[in-house]
Curated annotation (Swiss-Prot):
Pfam families according to UniProt: KH_2 (PF07650), Ribosomal_S3_C (PF00189)
Residue ranges, compositional bias (Low complexity): 216-225, 245-263
Record domain KH type-2: where: 38-106
A molecular function GO annotation: mRNA binding
Originating gene: rpsC
Family (UniProt): Belongs to the universal ribosomal protein uS3 family.
NCBIfam families: rpsC_bact
CC annotations in GO: cytosolic small ribosomal subunit
Disulfide bridges in this chain: none
Identification of the protein by name: Small ribosomal subunit protein uS3
Domain of life: Bacteria
Length: 270
C-alpha cells in the first residue's frame, strides 16, 4: 500500500503536517474551494518562480498565505510590485485581509516538487528523459539526500505507446512511517502530449513526534532519579565490611558441617 498512496497524506501527524490549517463548520466546502483557487492563482503563470508549496492559515478576519519558493525575487518583483499585485488579487478573491509571506527554499536540490518541476521543464525543452532523470538524481544525492526515485510516464521519446520508466538511487522506504519522504508531481507539456513526472526523496529518519517526546519525558519524570550504590571495597588485611561478612558466612558454614557430622555419628552409635 505504501507504493500507491501519497506519501504526504500517509504520514500526516507523524512526519508531515496539513498545508491548510483552519477549522470551519458550515463554511467548510467554501473554504476548500477557496484554497484550491488560491493555489491555482499562485501557480498559474509563475512556473519560473519555482514554487514548492503554498500553506494557508485562516482566522476570523485574516488569511495568512505562506509561499515557499526557490526564487523569491521573481515573486516579490521590482520594489515589491509583484507581491502587491498578488496580495490585491487574493484579497479580492477572499474578501478578507491577506498576509502574504514569501519564504525561500534553502536547498531546492532535495525538494521533491522543485526537482519534478525541473525535470518537466527539461522534457518540455526536448531534453532526453533519461538524461534529465539522471541529472536530477545526481544533484539530489550530492546535496545530502539518502535516496531518490524519479519516474516519468507518458509517450517517452515520442513513442506511439505510452509507458513508465523510473530510476532510483539509495534507499526510499515508502512503508516506513517514521521515514522523512518528500513527494512531488508535475506535468510536462510536449508536442507528443503530457508526460507526468513523480519524485520521491528520502531525507533520513524523522525525529520523534511531539506526543512521543512528551510521553518519554513523563515516563522519565515518573521513574525519578535513580541512585547507584558503590560496591564495597575490600581493604588489605581482610578489613572492611565485605571481608567481615565473608568470614561470618564461612564460620556459619563450618558450624553447620560439624553439627551434621555429630548428628550422623550419634545415629551410627545408637
Amino acid at each position: 500500500m505504501g507504493q500507491k498512496v501519497n506519501p504526504h497524506g500517509f504520514r500526516l501527524g507523524v512526519t508531515t503536517d496539513f498545508k491548510s490549517r483552519w477549522f470551519a463548520d458550515k463554511l467548510y466546502k467554501d473554504y476548500v474551494k477557496e484554497d484550491v483557487a488560491i493555489r491555482q492563482m499562485l501557480t498559474r503563470g509563475m512556473e519560473r518562480a519555482g514554487i514548492s508549496k503554498v500553506e494557508i492559515e485562516r482566522t476570523r478576519e485574516r488569511v495568512r498565505v505562506d509561499v515557499h519558493t526557490a526564487r523569491p525575487g521573481i515573486v516579490i518583483g521590482r520594489r515589491g510590485a509583484e507581491a502587491d499585485r498578488i496580495r490585491a488579487n487574493l484579497e479580492k478573491l477572499t474578501n478578507k485581509q491577506v498576509q502574504l509571506n514569501i519564504l525561500e527554499v534553502k536547498n531546492p536540490e532535495i525538494d521533491a516538487q522543485l526537482v519534478a518541476q525541473g525535470v518537466a521543464e527539461q522534457l518540455s525543452s526536448r531534453v532526453a528523459f533519461r538524461r534529465a532523470m539522471r541529472k536530477a538524481i545526481q544533484s539530489a544525492m550530492k546535496s545530502g539526500a539518502k535516496g531518490i526515485r524519479v519516474q516519468c510516464s507518458g509517450r517517452l521519446g515520442g513513442a506511439e505507446m505510452s509507458r513508465s520508466e523510473f530510476y532510483r538511487e539509495g534507499r526510499v522506504p515508502l512503508h516506513t512511517l517514521r521515514a522523512d519522504i518528500d513527494y512531488g508531481f508535475f506535468e510536462a507539456r510536449t508536442t507528443f502530449g503530457r508526460i507526468g513526472v513523480k519524485v520521491w526523496i528520502y531525507k533520513g529518519e524523522a525525529p520523534m513526534t511531539r506526543a512521543e517526546r512528551e510521553a518519554a519525558q513523563a515516563a522519565q519524570r515518573a521513574a525519578g532519579p535513580q541512585r547507584r550504590e558503590r560496591p564495597g571495597r575490600r581493604r588489605r588485611g581482610g578489613g572492611g565490611g565485605g571481608g567481615q561478612q565473608q568470614q561470618q558466612a564461612e564460620k556459619a558454614t563450618a558450624q553447620a558441617t560439624e553439627a551434621a557430622k555429630a548428628a550422623k555419628s550419634g545415629n551410627e552409635g545408637s
